[in-house]
Amino acid sequence: MAYSYTEKKRIRKNFGKLPSVMDAPYLLSIQVDSYRTFLQDGKSPKNREDIGLQAAFRSVFPIESYSGNAALEFVEYGLGKPEFDVRECILRGSTYAAPMRVKIRLIIKDRETKSIKDVREQEVYMGEIPLMTENGTFVINGTERVIVSQLHRSPGVFFDHDKGKTHSSGKVLYSARIIPYRGSWLDFEFDAKDLVYVRIDRRRKLLASVILRALGYNNAQILDLFYEKVPVYLDFGSYQIDLVPERLRGEMAQFDIADNDGKVIVEQGKRINARHVRQMEASGLTKLSVPDEYLYERITAEDITLRDGDVIAANTLLSHEIMVKLAEGGVKQFNILYTNDIDHGSFVADTLRADTTMGREDALVEIYKVMRPGEPPTKEAAENLFNNLFFSSERYDLSPVGRMKFNRRLGRPYEVGTDQKSREVEGILSNEDIIDVLRTLVEIRNGKGEVDDIDHLGNRRVRSVGEMTENQFRVGLVRVERAVKERLSQAETDNLSPQDLINAKPVAAAIKEFFGSSQLSQFMDQNNPLSEITHKRRVSALGPGGLTRERAGFEVRDVHQTHYGRVCPIETPEGPNIGLINSLSVYAKANDFGFLETPYRKVVDGRVSDDVEYLSAIEEVGTVIAQADSAVDADGHLMEEMVSVRHQGEFVRMPPEKVTHMDVSAQQVVSVAASLIPFLEHDDANRALMGSNMQRQAVPTLLADKPLVGTGMEANVARDSGVCVIAKRGGMIEFVDASRVVIRVNEEEMIAGEAGVDIYNLIKYTRSNQNTCINQKVLVNLGDKVGRGDVLADGPSTDGGELALGQNMRVAFMTWNGYNYEDSILLSERVLQEDRLTSIHIQELSCVARDTKLGAEEITADIPNVGEAALSKLDESGIVYIGAEVTAGDILVGKVTPKGETQLTPEEKLLRAIFGEKAADVKDSSLRVPSGTKGTVIDVQVFTRDGLEKDDRALAIEKAQLDAYRKDLKEEYKIFEEAARERIVRLLNGQESNGGGTTKRGDKLSDDVLSGLELVDLLDIQPTDEGIAERLSQIQVFLKEKSAEIDEKFAEKKRKLATGDELTTGVLKVVKVYLAVKRRIQPGDKMAGRHGNKGVVSNILPVEDMPHDANGVPVDVVLNPLGVPSRMNVGQILETHLGLAAKGLGEQIDKMLQQQRTIAELRIFLDKIYNKVGGEQEELDTLTDEEILVLAGNLRKGVPLATPVFDGAEEGQIKELLELAELPRTGQQILFDGRTGEQFDRPVTVGYMYMLKLNHLVDDKMHARSTGSYSLVTQQPLGGKAQFGGQRFGEMEVWALEAYGAAYTLQEMLTVKSDDVEGRTRIYKNIVDGNHYMDPGMPESFNVLTKEIRSLGINIELKNGD
């Protein structure tokens, strides 16, 4: 195994025993692929498939005028270049989008001959379409957003029952529902009397026969569709029927059944069983004589015409009178329906009999009345309405998915139609479709077949970004279509062009509304790389067209057996959304139909192959799947006699020959966040859920520290989240500094004619959506050789290209003076000194200058009534300097607002006369630092409205940006020139010159000659080899193009910066100030491990007071041992033991390095760690001595270990490693009290645990209020930090004071501290005067109560007793 540049610096020892068949796929593919498919941007218009945008256009166009003489046709669409790049859009607060132009063709026909008279083609601007960034997000109005995928009910047909809840008798009522992708729902349902009803769009129910009549069937045809016939023969006054013995099975014999010899096979009153059926078949009976009573209540199958011309209608119940009529009417033979009470109910026939409608017209009118109540029905209107409901491709679409599910459920074959026409035909319902659904429903009612499981993942599909955007786009286009149809009739006469006909605003509005305010377009959770990835891989059952929290029951939220490998059973929010919002499993992906698939290895005749097959939940039915950890021999044969498998949702044991598939990985079940929890298999599911949710809230620490005990998924998450800088092509590091890396690309990876230079610009100290800090740090050195996919720079919360959410802390499980009561956490001051849990938060504060009625607001340093000291941090323009350290109340941006004329006091008049006008007519409305905040200004951005003159600060910022950009471009060009020069020297070395430059014809070109020449001279040389001459000219052309491109880029940047900014109406200027706040850990901050073990820091002790071991090493964290047993998350204890071993091994290596042992000894020790304890073998022999030294140096602080989920380290292996590290096998040590030096009673579990600092910091939560704003009605203080509110003193708190008898305190709480308006003003004045006297009055809420009672019409008055 070859190690990459990043891997070999720090190899993670992996305990996984199972072979890796496939690597985890790209984790953001569900987002990226979906949107790429939607746009089809890379494909030429001719080759675009009929999906996504193309399909949306195709479905709406061509648009024809009402007369049919003019039509608009869609030709192709194209996307332009976005005006600003992603970073600029975030800064400017604009949307990252590309303009879309659509080529439209207008065809005008001759009115009489209908031949084409005129064709006009034109490009029409259709608004902007948001583009996805590389990492699967969208930038909308300057904020990064994620479109969450939706898990909704798949279109198709579903059969269900009410579980006996509807009717009081508890009878189970069956129903069928046809759900289209868009259009009306069609429901069939039984009632308690076993009649079949139909509902359209959940409206009032009609008898199901109404819709059959509307489809054009009469009674006899309907009966023919649903029933088999039984011929009845009338012979000499007795009746005979054809005998089909199988049909009689299970019925009660109403008379003796005898064979031809008169031997009785079944006696009257006995139930006919399988033995009787066999006897009847053996006896050779073909006809059966039946008594008249047997035929009573049977149903006629068709109209029977009597001798005298009378007709007995189909679907008539036979009775004595009718039988007499038949005999007298000379009928020798007629058909009845085959019905019985067991498995051939007469439901459809009974429904027909109950139906009062006579023919098709009646039925259509009935349907019209239900759909359009109150409108007078006409024949045409009823006909149109019915046809538009299910048979018009404009109004109804099952979609390919729906048609596939529909045909599958009804047991029909299905192939996807590729062309538009066949898609439209398959998208609408046919008569057969409706009849087949009804037939299946009746069969299920008859006891044949099963109802569907709604929560089966074969009946729920994922709608991703692309599909949702396409639907919104189609909505916009349909709005456009309506407007265009109106105008098309004008186009025939007024000579209009496509541009005049199409107004793109509705399309743009629909798209903007979706991305801006849809429930599924969410503000990206950007706490750390894991939270980003998880947010993009989320699937939600909520949202438009989905469930609502209130209506979702337990079944929908529950884990279903089909979730295995598709949706994570662990990661879901706690609270009202539990089970409705899920996360995709690591290996899951959505197929073309939107159903979730998971990979399996194929198993043939008990032998496991390496072929991987993705199966959806539908395809998985009937397969036999072995677990990933099933024992397999060297040839891949399953070794156990009976293998534990999953079959039809159950766990059973089967012989190897029956196994069809096998899991690809033990981590297949869980999501990315859950797969990052080591020893997950030893944790209770509830705690694992908390663990995976809390990892997403971890704040990136100042110094990222990789976990000593990981799971091997860390590198995947860091790579795919996009926070690291990854090399796109391999090569050599040509230049590196804090803000950029330049790579000279390998020859073999270059494209012909390019200079082969890749430049990576790093992101420095930027604010994330959650106000955490995004910063990238370089990992490579000058001259290093890197390969494609290597990590060049770490992002936030990554260390060496691995996810690093927290810190490895030395923990002890013991009690310490009550400081770990109720899960509190005791920390050592050392953690604070080493800045281990320090994080940087960046806040954005903005100041907006508007145009008001009284005049424009102005940003200035000339602020009335403010001393010099307050202005000391501002420049001449009134904006704070970068680097200024500011605290609460400091002015960041000076701003004055004009105020209206007021009556002046004599003193003010005097001031005005002395100091001039300025101070009087403006008020100070500057931007100040909010209370409780203290930090350093790290950046300032000034945006000025187009057309206004920019102030000095804005010009200075602009100049600095231009200078930096020019420097960048110059360096870029210089790098290209150097690379080109090197290539030219390489090409010309050893060649013969044909003259040109400073060489003469026939000169041999050697390295010495060439290296002394300038690039210009080198380009002039003409070698004799034509191939090389050709390549030289290519390089020359490339350099010219590059130079022109760089000039163009600079001019473009200058133009962008010079033009003003698009600000909202009435805004003249916006100043954004960015503050960096350093947050050290302090009591009140929330911390957690990865196993759901969370707590609040209770105290930070001096290092010398912390418990320490015999060597004097103090612990960093003291945790409560009582937090483990009841919560059943034992994973944390195993992690602690393994962490201790990892740290101990690191110390051993450190000791060896300090003693300067030989590299051979080092190799032996490393081999013991990596290859002698079990798990995956590492090939350390492939590393050079130098690389071994680098590796050992990086392992000094601990050897990183990986214990994959469900395939992790075993107890024995942990003990072996502890022994190797020369530590006690128990993982427990004797500790001493730091204050007294006394030994604690018993050994304590000490080790290293990975602890996270969560984004619930006490600084963000705590605030203090003296006076502030009050609620309007109750006059009580508001609540919450944002409103600068007070602390609620509720009902229970009042009880507490009553119990203590603290009457005065209680009176103070309920009056002057709350809503006694006069009392509180009085006490405020008193306190200011230094007098604490309280004079309570009437609380305002009492007045509110009396007013409420009065509003009920009860007169209540307060009498003041003297």
UniProtKB/Swiss-Prot annotation:
Enzyme nomenclature, EC number: 2.7.7.6
Keyword terms of this UniProt record: DNA-directed RNA polymerase, Nucleotidyltransferase, Transcription, Transferase
Keyword NAD listed: no
Pfam families per UniProt: RNA_pol_Rpb2_1, RNA_pol_Rpb2_2, RNA_pol_Rpb2_3, RNA_pol_Rpb2_45, RNA_pol_Rpb2_6, RNA_pol_Rpb2_7
SUPFAM superfamilies to which the protein is assigned, alphabetical: beta and beta-prime subunits of DNA dependent RNA-polymerase (SSF64484)
Catalytic activity reported: RNA(n) + a ribonucleoside 5'-triphosphate = RNA(n+1) + diphosphate
GO molecular function: DNA binding; DNA-directed RNA polymerase activity; ribonucleoside binding
Alphabetical list of InterPro entries matching this protein: DNA-dir_RNA_pol_bsu_ext_1_sf, DNA-dir_RNA_pol_bsu_external_1, DNA-dir_RNA_pol_su2, DNA-dir_RNAP_su2_dom, DNA-dir_RNAP_su2_hyb_sf, RNA_pol_bsu_bac, RNA_pol_bsu_CS, RNA_pol_bsu_protrusion
Record keyword Cell division present: no
UniProt GO cellular component terms: DNA-directed RNA polymerase complex
Role according to the record: DNA-dependent RNA polymerase catalyzes the transcription of DNA into RNA using the four ribonucleoside triphosphates as substrates.
HAMAP family linked: RNApol_bact_RpoB
NCBIfam families: PRK00405.1, rpoB
Subunit structure: The RNAP catalytic core consists of 2 alpha, 1 beta, 1 beta' and 1 omega subunit. When a sigma factor is associated with the core the holoenzyme is formed, which can initiate transcription.
Protein name: DNA-directed RNA polymerase subunit beta
Organism of this sequence: Acinetobacter baylyi (strain ATCC 33305 / BD413 / ADP1)
